[in-house]
Amino acid sequence: MAQKQYQFVAIGDTVTDAFIRVKDASVHCSIDKEKCEICFRFGDKVPYEDVYIIPAVGNSANAAVSAARLGLSSALVSNVGDDYFGKECLDTLAAEKVGTEFISVHRGKKTNYHYVLWYEDDRTILIKHEEYPYALPNFDSPPWVYLSSLGGNSAEFHENVTNYLES
């Protein structure tokens, strides 16, 4: 069976975001409002208003979904763990008509999961990128390639993407 030719391929980490709407906090800013800090009393139980779980996001996943919604045939090159959140990401992307055949599922690894502390009109994100063995799959050259956020161990992978694009 011939491989599908995509118009848009996004490359980057996929994540599930948990947006936690914080109820009470104090914000301390420098006099010029350039640097602000959200503060909670250490050791307190901090109430929150609500939490919204958004699977299959991140710069590259968002770009792939956006391209698909605009009518382009779109795929994502990414990695997920073999956990509930990985399956949920794959299902969400498939429902958005994003090709998932270039997403590697890694046994014994967790899917990236970030906590977004959302207070008033801003947010702070607690992030952790799993260290996946990044590998560029074989795919036909699309007119558009989007590369974004990857884990700290991805320097060699960046070179592989550069070499692919230059070939």
What are these regions (language model features)?
Residues 59-62, 85, 110, 155-157:
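Short glycine/serine/threonine-rich phosphate/pyrophosphate-binding segments
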Residues 2-77, 87:
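Glycine-rich phosphate/adenosyl-contacting loop at the front of the ribokinase-like
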Residues 81-84, 119:
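Subtilisin-like peptidase catalytic core
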Residues 77-78, 149:
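Small/polar loops that bind or transfer phosphate-bearing groups
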Residues 78-82, 101-110:
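Beta-strand->loop->alpha-helix junctions that form or flank phosphate-binding loops
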Residues 114:
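Conserved beta-strand and immediately adjacent loop positions that scaffold enzyme active sites
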